Amino acid sequence: MLLGKFLLVASFILPIAYTWTGATIRNHPADVVAARNKITSRSVARSEPTNSYIRPCYFTNWAQYRQGRAKFVPEDYTPGLCTHILFAFGWMNADYTVRAYDPADLPNDWAGEGMYRRVNKLKVTDTQLKTLLSFGGWSFGTALFQGMAASSASRKVFIDSAITFVRTWGFDGIDIDWEYPSGATDMANYVALVKELKAACESEAGSTGKDRLLVTAAVAAGPATIDAGYDIPNLAPNFDFILLMSYDFFGAWASLVGFNSPLYATTELPAEWNGWNVDSSARYWNQKGMPKEKIIVGMPTYGRGWTLNNASAINPGTSGSPAKITQYVQEAGVGAYFEFCEMLANGATRYWDSQSQVPYLVQGNQWWSYDDEESFANKMAYVKREGYGGAFVWTLDFDDFNAGCSNSNGQLYPLISVIAKELGGVIIPKKGGVTTAPTTVATTVTTGRPPMTSAVTTTTAATTTTTRAATTTTASNTNVCSGKSDGFYPNSNNCGLFVLCLSSKSYSMSCPSGLQYSASLKYCTTSTASGCSVTTTRAPTTTTKSAPTVTTTTRAPTTTTPAFKCTKDGFFGVPSDCLKFIRCVNGISYNFECPNGLSFHADTMMCDRPDPSKCAK
């Protein structure tokens, strides 16, 4: 996984008690801008049910920030598509307690009920669906995992906190995405962590009467990384299943052109790479002690590409540099499936490697390795033939989830629908299908498999906090968002209020005390600069129950500081003023102030109690 970039829906989100270093993408960054075509609820039909296979799908919370057709939200999910949804990602504090990665994951004024609840509400229409919160990811790094796993005391802090957190928000399990444990110490500590996590989940289930939380992990596919980090015989009994990241075997970080996720080896590449494929990785995990039924094979809905050094040398094994930035993903060498189908519709040539059983496409000097319906079908046949536990996807949002490709024939999720059909007997409808939920979906386990059910009752919030209630369309702004794109709009009756439009729904919001919303600037500013002449009044506040968290109310961004140049995404302190900080997104800087007398701590990248030693230097 590489650190990704993303666009903020609300550029004034403040990282109070959240270390928000930019959106994380498993194994590849993605920032997509396009025209959106939103699909809501749909029904599924069933073909031959094959109930023994697990079909998890990773949901990325930052896909909500994309624009147009590429914007993905939980409501774009189709019932029956997956057996499990893994929410990427949960995060960890320096004291090893867990927290939300993004304020939008939790209920707040501008995001409504929050992504956690929106994802878990999918279980209302997909009654067999299970959800897990995945902790970690590539950009999370290894240091916090290593520190947390180093002692029984610190492991207990994480485990107890994680169990409470996922129960509070209605998840059915915990997924560990440590990329990657390495060395004898990490190997031993990783085993201890997983054993103690499993035991704690069993104890919690016994004391509460709830179904046990699932315990899973995303794991490496490269032989050397497997050997360096995983004591597989001692891990195997404690996992319900593992998610084998059988992709990113080749990418533009190296000049050698190869396949992102080949099923088998190819003689086109040097023999030293013969172990770098799906089959070899899955077999290796099994040979080292992981039961086949617990191995869930990874399926990418994205691809990797190169700019060929010689446009006439198109066979795998040639050389190149990263492919050009694509229209949506905006990261050299990485593309989404819905981009590849457009390339093919616009003249790219598709080739098929009969040995690796995957396609690649060439368009001029651009060479892309990707997966399509044919390679997905071949891999599903392989999973069934070899007896593995199922297949998972990274990610939901890189498939053509809304049938936006010009040659899609209206098929929603053309790649993931292959998994649903071949492993679950579920037929995903075409765009515009009947909007009723399936009465039955594929179950997640068969007799002899570890228990996979974990119906959770969301825990009532433990604390009371005073917040401004997010409301749908108000009387003074009836249908204000009808036909409008997502974004911020002025309140026609009150300069101190403004409206956030999301998916044609409106949310009333208010500026910090004394400020007014500027329709031209699109943020809150002084009354003299706002250009608004409507009488200003403050929005009422109500006391509501919420899950234990910290205040996320922020001050609006001021104008960009000319002297600061954004060289990477993230949060940065302002050396001349401890109360201020800068958020960089795609090379653009946004200025913020910490609220309520707090100061910005450069080490934690949070607003906290004033401490001059923590200010940016």
Swiss-Prot record:
Q: Has keyword Repeat?
A: yes
Its domain of life reads: Eukaryota
Q: Which GO terms describe its molecular function?
A: chitin binding; chitinase activity; endochitinase activity
The positions annotated for binding chitin are 109-110, 136-139, 180, 245-248, 394
Q: Which cysteines are joined by disulfide bonds?
A: 57-82, 511-524, 594-607
Instruction: Please name the InterPro entries in this protein's record.
Output: Chitin-bd_dom, Chitin-bd_dom_sf, Chitinase_II/V-like_cat, Chitinase_insertion_sf, Glyco_hydro18_cat, Glyco_hydro_18_chit_AS, Glycoside_hydrolase_SF, Glycosyl_Hydrlase_18
Q: Which residues form the Chitin-binding type-2 domain?
A: 478-534, 563-617
Q: List, from the UniProt record, the residues annotated as the active site of this protein.
A: 179
> What catalytic activity is recorded?
Random endo-hydrolysis of N-acetyl-beta-D-glucosaminide (1->4)-beta-linkages in chitin and chitodextrins
Identify the EC number(s): 3.2.1.14
Pfam families reported in the protein's UniProt record: CBM_14, Glyco_hydro_18
Which residues have a glycan attached per UniProt? Answer: 310
Report domain GH18 positions: 53-426
Name the Gene Ontology biological process terms.
Answer: ATF6-mediated unfolded protein response; chitin catabolic process; polysaccharide catabolic process; response to fungus
Q: Which GO terms describe its cellular component?
A: extracellular region
Top EC class per UniProt?
A: hydrolase
Entry keyword set: Carbohydrate metabolism, Chitin degradation, Chitin-binding, Disulfide bond, Glycoprotein, Glycosidase, Hydrolase, Polysaccharide degradation, Repeat
The family assignment reads:
Belongs to the glycosyl hydrolase 18 family. Chitinase class II subfamily.
Q: What is this protein called?
A: Probable endochitinase
What is the organism field in this record? Caenorhabditis elegans
